[in-house]
């Protein structure tokens, strides 16, 4: 198992750190052999957290895929220190993978009070922000973060396979850099979230007036004492809400869950 620890100066105002409780969050990113968590393995993980004005990143990389259990054990120690975590597209990959592997090896990883998938949080506002893409690199560039690394996830997987055969130190350093840089930018992406909220930026895919009227009518019909924040509901989410309200009786909590799980 290869272990690295990096200390980086955190260039975020204390006010924003406190407003968004950024120092109460563990930030992480995994590298895997397959997108299917039942078939693949986690071979690298980077975990970041804030201490004072520093952003600390701890990183574990398997020199052999048989070390995956050890990687999960060490990661769990850090993940379980925090009530909240943040990822980029973690709802689709990192979270299910981590839980799948923790169950496989009998290692407890606690569910989180708050989970922030920055991909899902920021993507609906990309066009309103003038962005053509919703990639991590695109959001990084928007806030002035220039990467050293230029690889994508598929490149990294190929390079890892090369490393397993060659043990080339340069290849190793490149894949470690990619994984750590994927985590380094995560707290900074909250600056975009902060900007969106304080400037009342609208979603690019905001629900239509017709959908808004339909939801309002169905909520009243169901006798729910609830007014959704329509400024945060997409067309896709609106379709789910309308379907759910038509299909069955929903409580306010059920409706909030539908909204929360959509983006």
Enumerate the language-model features and the residues they cover.
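Nucleic-acid-processing active sites and adjacent nucleic-acid-binding tracks
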Residues: 56-76
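Metal-dependent phosphoesterase core characteristic of DEDDh/y 3'-5' exonuclease domains
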Residues: 40-48, 55-56, 92-195, 199-202
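A short, exposed loop/beta-hairpin motif centered on an aromatic-Gly-Thr core
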Residues: 58-63, 226-233
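Acidic beta-strand-to-loop metal/phosphate-binding motif
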Residues: 83-92
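Two-metal-ion RNase H-like nuclease active-site motif
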Residues: 24-33, 179
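A short amphipathic alpha-helical interaction element
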Residues: 140, 207-225, 238-244
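Low-complexity, Ser/Pro/Thr/Glu/Lys-rich regulatory segments of predominantly eukaryotic nuclear proteins
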Residues: 203-205, 239-263
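N-terminal accessory regions of nucleic-acid-interacting proteins
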Residues: 1-23
């Amino acid at each position: 198992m290869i272990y690295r620890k990096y200390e980086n100066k955190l260039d975020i105002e204390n006010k924003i750190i406190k407003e968004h409780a950024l120092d109460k969050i563990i930030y992480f990113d995994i590298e895997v052999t397959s997108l299917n968590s039942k078939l693949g393995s986690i071979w690298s993980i980077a975990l970041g957290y804030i201490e004072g004005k520093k952003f600390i990143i701890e990183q574990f990389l398997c020199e052999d895929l048989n070390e995956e259990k050890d990687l999960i054990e060490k990661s769990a120690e850090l993940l379980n220190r925090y009530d909240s975590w943040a990822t980029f597209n973690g709802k689709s990959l990192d979270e299910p993978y981590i839980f799948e592997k923790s169950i496989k090896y009998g290692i407890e990883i606690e569910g989180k009070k708050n989970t922030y998938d920055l991909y899902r949080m920021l993507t609906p506002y990309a066009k309103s922000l003038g962005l053509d893409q919703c990639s991590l690199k695109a959001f990084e560039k928007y806030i002035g973060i220039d990467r050293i690394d230029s690889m994508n996830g598929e490149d990294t997987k190929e390079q890892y396979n090369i490393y397993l055969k060659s043990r080339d130190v340069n290849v190793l350093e490149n894949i470690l850099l990619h994984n750590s840089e994927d985590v380094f930018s995560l707290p900074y992406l909250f600056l975009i979230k902060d900007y969106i909220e304080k400037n009342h930026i609208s979603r690019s895919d905001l629900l239509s007036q017709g959908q808004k009227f339909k939801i309002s009518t169905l909520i009243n019909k169901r006798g729910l004492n609830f007014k959704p924040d329509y400024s945060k509901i997409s067309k896709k989410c609106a379709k789910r809400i309308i379907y759910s309200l038509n299909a069955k009786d929903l409580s306010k909590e059920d409706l909030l869950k539908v909204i929360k799980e959509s983006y």
